[in-house]
Regions:
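Catalytic-domain carbohydrate-binding cleft regions of carbohydrate-active enzymes
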Residues: 1-262
């Protein structure tokens, strides 16, 4: 989900249910770095990430700025600091990472090209990151190249390797990220987007109310509510919070209707 358009409780459930699902298939998986393809950020994330055991984060989405992007700030690393004071070591959208000329969806980091790297060097960024997550199935990537054709001698590493083996691994630059530094743009959808937002918020409120009522009933008279039913309610709500439900609500789904209709 985009995170800036749903409740804090929903963000927590997205992590809780998502981590549980992944561990049902990969029991030994570790969750170390939060990095996303789309602009799925909000100011309170450092606190939530820390509670789920994450150590690092990235504020970059250089090839998916349709739905938004973070404000440019800082150099190689920052301590992304939430309103409550919780911080997490983060690779930001650098102060020198500009919006790509003649593009409405990219920053200059998307292709790790020479002008971007030179701008990073001028800003004393020793280990610039040029990254772009791509949807599974795209035929024309990876954009930075592969095999013997990798642009500017780029090196592919995981975020964990970058933070722990390549970067300095620490910084004194505390970035107190306000919600206003999340520059958002849900430009497709108009009236249907308003309806989606209203229905999602109504469902968020009703699910939490149902859980509270169930707890009170259990304490009062031993009533045992159906956890599986509530889990299914959260599952379908979380699908409605998927970023594509908001950014492209009129897109078709395998000739089975649109995101909005489902």
């Amino acid at each position: 989900p985009y995170c800036y358009n749903i409740s804090g409780e929903s963000i927590i459930r997205q992590f809780a249910y998502g981590i549980r699902k992944i561990r049902s298939h990969f029991p030994d998986v570790e969750f170390v770095t939060y990095s996303v393809e789309e602009p799925c950020f909000t100011s309170s994330l450092p606190q939530i990430l820390r509670l789920f055991g994450f150590k690092y984060a990235s504020l970059k989405c250089p090839n998916t700025c349709w739905g938004g992007y973070t404000a440019p700030y800082g150099g190689e690393l920052v301590n992304w600091t939430a309103p409550d004071g919780t911080s997490i070591l983060t690779s930001p959208r650098y102060a020198c990472e500009e919006l790509q000329p003649n593009s409405v969806w990219q920053t200059t980091a998307w292709g790790n090209e020479t002008p971007y790297i030179e701008a990073c060097i001028r800003q004393d960024i020793a280990h610039p990151v040029g990254m772009c997550y791509q949807d599974a199935g795209w035929r024309y990537g990876p954009w930075i190249g592969s095999g013997d054709s990798i642009r500017n001698n780029s090196i592919y590493v995981t975020w964990r390797e970058y933070f722990e083996r390549i970067s300095e691994g620490r910084t004194t630059d505390d970035y107190r990220f306000p919600q206003e530094d999340m520059h958002v743009s849900l430009m497709w959808g108009s009236q249907v987007l308003q309806r989606i937002a209203q229905q999602v918020r109504e469902s968020e409120n009703k699910l939490v109310m149902a859980e509270k009522a169930g707890v009170i009933a259990n304490l009062a008279n031993g009533y045992r509510y159906g956890q599986a039913t509530l889990d299914e309610g959260w599952r379908t709500l979380m699908l409605a919070q998927h970023h594509d439900s908001w950014i492209v609500p009129y897109n078709g789904l395998n000739r089975q209707g649109t995101w909005a209709q489902h």
